[in-house]
Structure formats: structure tokens, C-alpha cells
């Protein structure tokens, strides 16, 4: 009896997390893995995160719909932890359908997911405009933060409210009565027309209704039926509102713990946790970045890696791989294996550096401090590795990769004590090596 009580259920779910500041290349991995799983779930964030997928000579950027939508046998779910801009969602559905992929019957949206309203976007921009210089958070202006603020203040409007016009009108009028006072009295800006928003959002109910369901119930029934689930995170661990470089973070939990609260899938159903990291480091917007390179090397990384934000188009800051930060992310999210992306960006570097520790006030430290007042003062300590000066794009196995590229991967495994199982050696689906 004791053995039965304490036995662990067979794991049905895998979590995929970014282990840096976002933009790690999760889209390619999800696209590749989607034919191995029955269901792909997006569990947090909103249209502030872009996942880029390259296939059949096309490059597609998705912000809300899970990357698995391009596998015709895969069911995609937008979970309760996501905040949804209905305009962005409908545009994305149209984009996918224009590419020849049927969405109906394959896309499910949580009835409990919160909505991003026009006043959220307005307040997002107004709030950011009041901050100066380095204090700016670097928000995308998509209304993500204000929507989450309303969610936790218990004032949010959810997808289920969109389907009941009377409830929608009541909640919109109640919310805008308060928001307009803030906009006019504090920010001294023109108030938002309540009736115009009501008219606009009333039209979304028919368009979104076919996709809406209780996804928590749906997912757990699928687990009982033996289906497998891939839980896809947006952004990265270092942007987590609780565990990231606060205050320069996102408004949700990209770490693996957020996968459960943002989907309704319990932790005991999770088996593997795959961490995705670039072979170097990038960051968009403000915030501490110990290995940032403001020189020709940083410029080269950005140019070769095409480092521009998929959502905002902003130029990404670039630097060497930071093992101190990466080790922290691996620990916080309980990463069981790593997927290394954009290794090909390093193909032309004779010398490659990796940060192995920091110097802080004359002392060497190995733990990652998330607080700005400490992280802003650290200096990276680097280990130099030999570059490979060759392409690995045609390699079909780890053994076929250049010996120095193999040495780089092996070094990361030893330093992080986590196996690297997936190596992206180019943007295409077939430019992938498994270890």
C-alpha cells in the first residue's frame, strides 16, 4: 500500500524554458519537437514575445499561437497564464491560415486567460515615459505589464467575459472610470472613449468563441488519455518577475514553475525540463548585462546573428556566454537537459570567451546576484577557448562536428553539469545535431 501511495505518476509533460534574457531560439526547438508531442501549450507572457520559425524557405514570427501550429497533427493551447490582445490574436490566426494551415479544431484558448485592452497599452507607454534614462524598463508597449497588474488586482477582464456582452460592458465601464481618472489627472492626457472600446470588443466574441474552452480541464483529460504535452515558455528565466534581474524583468514567470500555474498541469505530470540557450548572450532593452561587448566583437555577434527583436525590431545587446547566469537559470528551473542554439554564429571567431565567474569588490564569486545594486558592479572573469573557423551546418552527428566545436559543447556540459542534447548549427530545421 505504501509503495502505491508514494509512487510517481508517469510523466506526460515536458517544459521548455529560455535560460537567458529571452530570444534564445525556442521557436525552432518547439517547431522541431512538435511532431513528438500531441499538444503544445503556451503558458505565460503575451504578444511581447516573438518566436521565429524557419521552414520550407519561409521565416515566420508568432507571438501568441504556440510554434507547434505548423505541424498539422499538433494541437495548440494558449493557457490561462497568457495575456491576450484579441487584435494580435486574430491577425496571427489569419497569418497562419494564409500559409495553408487550418487552425480550427487545433487551437484552444483558455477561458480564464486575461485580455489586453487598449487602455493597458496606453498606460504602458505613459508609465514608461515617466521614467528617465537607465531607469526605463524597456517595455514593448504592448500592454503586458498593465494587464498583469489588473489580473493581480482582481480587476482584469478575461476571455470568458468577452463572450458575455453584458458582463463585458459592465467591466469595461467600471475599469475605464478608474483608468480615465489616472490618464487625465495624473498623466494629463486625453481620456479614452469607453463606448468606442465596447463597440470594438463586442465584435470579437463571434471570432474568438470557436477556440475558447476550459483548457485546464481539457489538458488534464488529455493526460489521462495518455497524450503528451510540451509546455512552451516565452522570454527567459533571467526576465522572470520573481527570479530575474528585477526591476528589468517581464511581468510573468517564464521559469519552469510558471508552466504549471499558467496551464493547470500539475508538477507531478512534468518529466523533462529542457533549457534553451544561445552559444552567446543577448539582451533587449535596459538592465544589467555583465558580459556585454561594446566593441567590434559585440557588433559582429549582432550582425552575424541578425540580433533584432522579433517583436519590436530593436537591436539586441550582445556579449559572450555567461555561465554564472546560466548556472543560476539551470538551478531555478530545474533544467534536466540543454538545447544550444546559434552555435553557427561563432563559426568565424578565432577565439571564443566564456564567463566562468565574477569579480565583486576584489573577490571572486560564482553565484548570480539578481539585485541591480550588486549585479551592476560585477566584472566578468573569462576563460578563452579556441574557435573552429568552419561551418558545422552539414554535420549529421556530434562526431562530425569540428573538434573545437565539440570541445566548446563539452566544456559547457562539464561546467553546468547538465547534458547538451540538441545543437542548432543553422536556422533551418535540418541544421540540427543531436548529442
Swiss-Prot record:
Family: Belongs to the adenylosuccinate synthetase family.
Active-site residues, as the UniProt record annotates them: 23 (proton acceptor), 51 (proton donor)
Cofactor: how bound: Binds 1 Mg(2+) ion per subunit.
Organism: Chlorobaculum tepidum (strain ATCC 49652 / DSM 12025 / NBRC 103806 / TLS) (Chlorobium tepidum)
Binding site for substrate: 310-316
Binding site for Mg(2+): 23, 50
EC identifiers of the protein: 6.3.4.4
Protein name, entry field: Adenylosuccinate synthetase
Residue numbers binding GTP: 22-28, 50-52, 316, 342-344, 424-426
Amino acid at each position: 500500500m505504501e509503495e502505491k501511495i508514494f509512487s510517481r505518476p508517469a510523466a506526460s509533460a515536458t517544459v521548455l524554458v529560455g535560460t537567458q534574457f529571452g530570444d534564445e531560439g525556442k521557436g525552432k526547438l518547439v517547431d522541431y519537437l512538435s511532431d513528438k508531442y500531441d499538444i503544445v501549450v503556451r503558458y505565460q507572457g503575451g504578444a511581447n514575445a516573438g518566436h521565429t520559425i524557419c521552414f520550407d524557405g519561409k521565416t515566420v514570427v508568432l507571438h501568441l499561437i504556440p510554434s507547434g501550429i505548423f505541424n498539422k497533427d499538433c494541437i495548440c493551447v494558449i493557457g490561462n497564464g497568457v495575456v491576450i490582445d484579441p487584435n494580435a490574436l486574430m491577425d496571427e490566426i489569419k497569418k497562419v491560415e494564409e500559409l495553408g494551415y487550418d487552425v480550427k479544431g487545433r487551437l484552444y484558448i483558455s477561458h480564464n486567460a486575461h485580455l489586453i485592452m487598449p487602455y493597458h497599452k496606453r498606460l504602458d507607454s505613459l508609465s514608461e515615459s515617466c521614467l528617465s534614462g537607465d531607469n526605463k524598463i524597456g517595455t514593448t508597449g504592448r500592454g503586458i505589464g498593465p494587464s498583469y497588474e489588473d489580473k493581480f488586482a482582481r480587476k482584469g477582464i478575461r476571455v470568458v467575459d468577452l463572450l458575455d456582452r453584458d458582463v463585458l460592458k459592465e467591466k469595461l465601464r467600471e475599469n475605464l472610470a478608474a483608468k480615465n481618472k489616472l490618464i487625465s489627472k495624473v498623466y494629463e492626457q486625453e481620456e479614452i472613449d469607453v463606448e468606442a472600446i465596447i463597440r470594438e470588443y463586442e465584435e470579437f466574441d463571434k471570432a474568438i468563441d470557436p477556440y475558447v474552452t476550459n483548457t485546464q480541464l481539457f489538458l488534464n483529460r488529455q493526460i489521462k488519455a495518455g497524450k503528451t504535452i510540451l509546455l512552451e515558455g516565452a522570454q527567459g528565466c533571467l526576465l522572470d518577475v520573481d527570479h530575474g534581474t528585477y526591476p528589468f524583468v517581464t511581468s510573468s514567470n517564464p521559469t519552469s514553475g510558471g508552466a504549471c500555474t499558467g496551464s493547470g498541469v500539475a508538477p507531478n505530470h512534468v518529466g523533462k525540463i529542457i533549457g534553451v540557450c544561445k552559444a552567446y548572450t543577448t539582451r533587449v532593452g535596459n538592465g544589467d548585462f555583465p558580459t556585454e561587448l561594446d566593441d567590434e566583437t559585440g557588433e559582429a555577434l549582432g550582425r552575424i546573428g541578425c540580433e533584432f527583436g522579433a517583436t519590436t525590431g530593436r537591436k539586441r545587446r550582445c556579449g559572450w556566454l555567461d555561465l554564472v547566469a546560466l548556472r543560476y537559470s539551470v538551478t531555478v528551473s530545474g533544467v534536466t537537459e540543454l538545447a544550444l542554439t546559434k552555435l553557427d554564429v561563432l563559426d568565424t571567431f578565432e577565439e571564443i570567451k566564456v564567463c566562468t565567474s565574477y569579480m565583486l569588490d576584489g573577490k571572486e564569486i560564482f553565484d548570480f546576484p539578481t539585485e541591480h545594486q550588486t549585479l551592476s558592479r560585477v566584472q566578468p572573469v573569462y576563460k578563452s577557448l579556441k574557435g573552429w573557423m568552419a561551418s558545422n551546418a552539414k554535420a549529421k552527428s556530434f562526431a562530425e562536428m569540428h573538434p573545437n566545436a565539440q570541445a566548446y559543447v563539452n566544456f559547457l556540459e562539464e561546467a553546468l553539469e547538465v547534458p547538451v542534447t540538441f545543437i542548432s548549427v543553422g536556422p533551418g530545421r535540418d541544421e540540427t545535431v543531436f548529442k
